[in-house]
């Protein structure tokens, strides 16, 4: 049982465990921190979210870790969260951000059985857009070091891994279409499909991204800015594609449905083209969808990672093993090529979200949160 003991301005866990509240370099954890907070519901991230300063650093409970975030991941669905679409019952203000990687700087007594101060961990949990985040030890993932490449696996990698394994029915020789293939999750869908010995087609928005896809083994990159996707699919794949990993929505979804082979499967993991609209949806030809699916005995199925959490740890372990061994490319985009340079600090998350919705990123967008040992934040 935890016993909180007041010590001046803040409380720490029982004095015998006070050492857990010093970071691994020996500097005291500050009393205040910065974090992003959703203060109004809106799909416009800048309107919805505020950088809040002088927030109290949270205390870990008995089974928790306090993680000092070094890198956090940006996801297309961050603006769905800021718009209140995932849980309409939650009202502002609330924390935002889905994933982070950093060091354990404090922990509860039960959590200390498995973790130590200074240990590198990655996690998928709400509230990562902060300098410090409390994470249940049961859902944290130990990692060899604090590398942004490991962070790419938490949401983007596991989404591709679990959805394709559970819903894709991949096997040698099947044709797989991956939309937004050079993005955060598309890069993994592309590589995992190739490892299953499939023929992979990947859509992207530039020649540079096309070259990136080729470097990963993509059989047919399609730069939709210079080639009409529908025409390419009809001419080069007249029998259709067996599996589609779809994250764009709108017109791209319609093209993907039309390209399905007999008994083809389309997995919807998102529809980014509609997220910034008031409804969060992009128009599709829903009226003709039943007839098209019936004609081909095809299927469309959604995938939401939270519904497959029982598969998460096994997927994460396998992906991490592949990443560490060099068997999986985990491309990170830290914004070095963006007009204002690298995404550094919580305030740069606003730029990072815009960068993503402009389609500029190659790989997973990651924001670095620098830390000075002597910083008082």
Curated annotation (Swiss-Prot):
Gene Ontology CC, one term: mitochondrion
Compartments where located: Peroxisome
Root EC class: oxidoreductase
Single GO BP term: lipid metabolic process
Reactions catalysed according to its record: 13,14-dihydro-15-oxo-prostaglandin E2 + NADP(+) = 15-oxoprostaglandin E2 + NADPH + H(+); 13,14-dihydro-15-oxo-prostaglandin E1 + NADP(+) = 15-oxoprostaglandin E1 + NADPH + H(+); 13,14-dihydro-15-oxo-PGF2alpha + NADP(+) = 15-oxoprostaglandin F2alpha + NADPH + H(+); 13,14-dihydro-15-oxo-prostaglandin F1alpha + NADP(+) = 15-oxoprostaglandin F1alpha + NADPH + H(+)
EC number: 1.3.1.48
Coiled-coil features, chain-numbered ranges: none
Modification sites for Phosphoserine: 299
SMART domains, A to Z: PKS_ER (SM00829)
Positions of post-translational N6-acetyllysine modification: 35
Keyword Phosphoprotein: yes
Database matches in Pfam families: ADH_N, ADH_zinc_N
Main function: Functions as 15-oxo-prostaglandin 13-reductase and acts on 15-keto-PGE1, 15-keto-PGE2, 15-keto-PGE1-alpha and 15-keto-PGE2-alpha with highest efficiency towards 15-keto-PGE2-alpha. Overexpression represses transcriptional activity of PPARG and inhibits adipocyte differentiation.
Record-stated family: Belongs to the zinc-containing alcohol dehydrogenase family. Quinone oxidoreductase subfamily.
Protein name per its UniProtKB record: Prostaglandin reductase 3
Species the sequence originates in: Homo sapiens (Human)
């Amino acid at each position: 049982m935890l016993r909180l003991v007041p010590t001046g301005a803040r409380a720490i866990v029982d004095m015998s465990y006070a050492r857990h509240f010093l970071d691994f370099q020996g500097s005291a954890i500050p009393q205040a921190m910065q974090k992003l907070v959703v203060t109004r519901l809106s799909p416009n991230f800048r309107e919805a979210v505020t950088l809040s300063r002088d927030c109290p650093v949270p205390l870990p409970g008995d089974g928790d870790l306090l993680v000092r975030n070094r890198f956090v991941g940006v996801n297309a669905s961050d603006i769905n969260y800021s718009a209140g679409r995932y849980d309409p019952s939650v009202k502002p203000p609330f924390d935002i951000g889905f994933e982070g990687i950093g060091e354990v700087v404090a922990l509860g007594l039960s959590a200390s059985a498995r973790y130590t101060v200074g240990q590198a961990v990655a996690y998928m949990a709400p509230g990562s857009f902060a300098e410090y985040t409390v994470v249940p030890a049961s859902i944290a993932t130990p990692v060899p070091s604090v590398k942004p490449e490991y962070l790419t696996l938490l949401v983007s990698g596991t989404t591709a891994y679990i959805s394709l394994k559970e819903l894709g029915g991949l096997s040698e020789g099947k044709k797989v279409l991956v939309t937004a293939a050079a993005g955060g999750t598309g890069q993994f869908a592309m590589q995992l499909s190739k490892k299953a010995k499939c023929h992979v087609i990947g859509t992207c928005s530039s020649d540079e991204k096309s070259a990136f896809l080729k470097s990963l083994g993509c059989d047919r990159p399609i730069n939709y800015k210079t080639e009409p996707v529908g025409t390419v699919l009809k001419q080069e794949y007249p029998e259709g594609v067996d599996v589609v990993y779809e994250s764009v929505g709108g017109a791209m979804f319609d093209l993907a449905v039309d390209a399905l082979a007999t008994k083809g499967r389309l997995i919807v993991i998102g529809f980014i083209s509609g997220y910034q609209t008031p409804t969060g949806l992009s128009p599709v030809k829903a009226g003709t969808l039943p007839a098209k699916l019936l004609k081909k005995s095809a299927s469309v199925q959604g995938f939401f990672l939270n519904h497959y959490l029982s598969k998460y740890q096994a997927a994460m372990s396998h992906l991490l093993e592949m990443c560490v061994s060099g068997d999986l490319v985990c491309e990170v985009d830290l914004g070095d090529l963006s007009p204002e340079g690298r995404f550094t600090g919580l305030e740069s998350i606003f730029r990072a979200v815009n960068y993503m919705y402009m389609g500029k990123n190659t790989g997973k967008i990651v924001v670095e949160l620098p830390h000075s040992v002597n910083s008082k934040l």
